[in-house]
Design a protein with these regions (language model features):
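Cytosolic-side transmembrane-helix boundaries in multi-pass membrane proteins
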Residues: 1-34, 210-217, 291-326
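Short loop segments and helix-boundary regions at transmembrane helix junctions
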Residues: 13-17, 75, 95, 113-153, ...
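Single transmembrane alpha-helix segments in multi-pass membrane proteins
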Residues: 31-96, 121-126, 264-274, 307
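Inter-helical junctions in multi-pass inner-membrane proteins, predominant
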Residues: 39-51, 144-150, 189-195, 222-258, ...
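Transmembrane helix-bundle core of multi-pass membrane transporters
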Residues: 125, 129-192, 218-221, 240-249, ...
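Transmembrane alpha-helical segments in multi-pass inner-membrane proteins
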Residues: 230, 240-306
C-alpha cells in the first residue's frame, strides 16, 4: 500500500513539474496580465492592446531565430545590427531602383549573408559564437552607418509604408506576419528533422555528430534563418518609421535573449519551444507597456529589464541543476 502511495505521489509530482515546465511562464504571464488590467489605468483598452501587439511583434519575430540559436547551444548578438542595416539597405535600394521588391530582396539578402558569415565562422571554423557574433554585430552596424552616411534614409515610395500600417481583419499587418512566423518556426522546431537536429546539437554536439547529424550544415542554416527573420523585422520597422535608421535597435539583442531565457529556453542548449518564446516576450512586453502607462522613467526601466534578465539567467541555472539532480 505504501509503495502504491509513494508511486502515485511520484507520478503526481512528476506530472506537475512537467506541466509547469511546459506552461508555467504562460501562467505567470496570465497572472501579470490580470494584475495590469486591474491596477494599470487604460491597460485593457483596445488601443493599448493593439499598441502592445505592435510593440512585441518585432521582438517575437527576431526571437524565433534566436530560439534556434540558443537551442543549438549558440548565441546571435548581431540581430539588432541586422535589423538596422536591413532597414537602411532596403530604403537605399528602393530610392535608387524605384522598386519595392528589389529593395525588400536586398534587405533580406543582407540578413541572409550576415547569417551565412556567422554560421560559416562558427560551424566550420569552430570560433565561439559569442565572439563571432560580437564581431559581426560591429561590422554590420558599421555598414549601416556607411550605407546611410550616418543619417536616417527617408523612403520616397509611399507604397512601402503599407507593410507597416496596413490592417488585416482589424489588426495591423505586422501582428499577422509575426503570428505566421511563430507558426512556421514552431512547426520547424517540433515537426521536422531539422528541428530535432537543432535540439540534438544543443544537447550534445559530439553525440549528435556521431549519430550522423549534419552539424555544420544545420548550424549554418540556423544562423541564416536568424539573419533572415532579423532582416524581415528590420524591413517592417523601416516601413513603420518611413525611413531606414542606422542607429535603431541598439541593445535589442539582449532583450530578445532575456525574453527567450525568461520563457524557458536554456542557455546551455538542447531545450526550447516556441511557447517559451511567446511567454517570455509577452511577459517582457507587458512589463514594459505597464511601466510606460505608469510614467516610469526610461532610466528606471533599464534597471527593471536588467533585473529581469539576471533573474532569468539565475532561474535557468537553477532549472539545469534541478534536472541534473533528478
Amino acid at each position: 500500500m505504501s509503495s502504491v502511495t509513494t508511486s502515485g505521489a511520484t507520478r503526481s509530482t512528476f506530472s506537475f513539474a512537467r506541466i509547469w515546465d511546459q506552461f508555467g511562464m504562460l501562467v505567470v504571464f496570465a497572472v501579470l496580465f490580470i494584475g495590469c488590467v486591474i491596477f494599470v489605468p487604460n491597460f485593457a483598452s483596445f488601443v493599448n492592446m493593439k499598441g502592445l501587439g505592435l510593440a512585441i511583434s518585432m521582438s517575437e519575430m527576431v526571437a524565433c531565430g534566436m530560439l534556434f540559436c540558443l537551442a543549438s547551444g549558440d548565441f546571435d548578438l548581431s540581430v539588432a545590427s541586422v535589423i538596422a542595416c536591413a532597414g537602411v539597405t532596403t530604403a537605399v535600394v528602393i530610392n535608387l531602383s524605384e522598386s519595392l521588391w528589389l529593395g525588400i530582396a536586398a534587405g533580406l539578402l543582407l540578413g541572409a549573408l550576415s547569417g551565412l558569415v556567422n554560421g560559416f565562422v562558427i560551424a566550420r571554423l569552430k570560433i565561439n559564437s559569442l565572439i563571432t557574433t560580437l564581431a559581426t554585430m560591429q561590422i554590420v552596424r558599421g555598414l549601416a552607418y556607411i550605407i546611410s552616411d550616418g543619417k536616417a534614409v527617408g523612403i520616397e515610395d509611399e507604397r512601402f509604408f503599407t507593410l507597416g500600417y496596413a490592417n488585416w481583419f482589424g489588426l495591423p499587418a505586422p501582428i499577422w506576419l509575426t503570428v505566421a512566423c511563430l507558426v512556421v518556426f514552431g512547426l520547424l522546431l517540433n515537426k521536422t528533422t531539422f528541428g530535432r537536429n537543432t535540439l540534438a546539437i544543443g544537447g550534445n554536439e559530439e553525440a549528435a555528430r556521431l549519430a550522423g547529424v549534419p552539424v555544420v550544415r544545420t548550424k549554418i542554416i540556423i544562423f541564416v534563418l536568424s539573419g533572415l527573420v532579423s532582416a524581415a523585422a528590420g524591413i517592417i520597422l523601416a516601413s513603420r518609421m518611413t525611413s531606414g535608421q542606422p542607429m535603431t535597435s541598439i541593445g535589442y539583442e539582449l532583450i530578445v535573449i532575456s525574453a527567450c531565457v525568461l520563457g524557458g529556453v536554456s542557455l546551455k542548449g538542447g531545450i526550447g519551444k516556441i511557447s517559451y518564446v511567446v511567454a517570455g516576450i509577452l511577459i517582457l512586453g507587458t512589463v514594459e507597456n505597464a511601466m510606460n502607462l505608469l510614467n516610469i522613467s526610461p532610466f528606471s526601466q533599464y534597471v527593471v529589464r536588467g533585473v529581469i534578465l539576471l533573474a532569468a539567467v539565475i532561474f535557468d541555472r537553477y532549472k539545469q541543476k534541478a534536472k541534473r539532480a533528478a
